[in-house]
Amino acid sequence: MNKALMVTKRDGKLEPINLDKIHRVITWAAEGLDNVSVSQVELRSHIQFYEGIRTSDIHETIIKAAADLISKDTPDYQYLAARLAVFHLRKKAYGHFDPPRLYDHVKKLVRMGKYDHALLDDYTREEWDEMDGFIDHWRDMTFSYAAVKQLEGKYLVQNRVTGEIYESAQFLYLLLRDRKSVV
């Protein structure tokens, strides 16, 4: 009898690997794409898993497995890898997939010293709520893998020493006009 592989969650707890959850995430990311194989990504990923692997490393392994399948004949793997990368970035930035409300996000990053306080001085809560209504976070799902990696590597506010990410693409784009207000 095989014992389930134990993984290390983001909070440090150990628990058995949940292959069904991994399958659901890859299947979700593959929705609507042509010539991508969820099972191919799973197979390429699973052989790299080891006892105690961190869930964040599992996610990075899956992203790399999808990216490695990008070719002239199977270009949609670039979108599969991108969607998985966006999912991972949001988990790193917010602790979960769904981004917070814009005002709450800005307030938090001002408090952390990542955004300038002028952002809160220059706009009312109502204006932030109105701007939040313009954001469609699902636009991130149309990016290519190369675009997501460019955003992550060059443009998103982050701690370049620890790799901690503080924002996602749609917040970046909305706040770009006020980038002078970002510390």
Regions found by a protein language model. Name each.
Residues M1-V183:
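Extended catalytic cores of very large enzyme megasubunits
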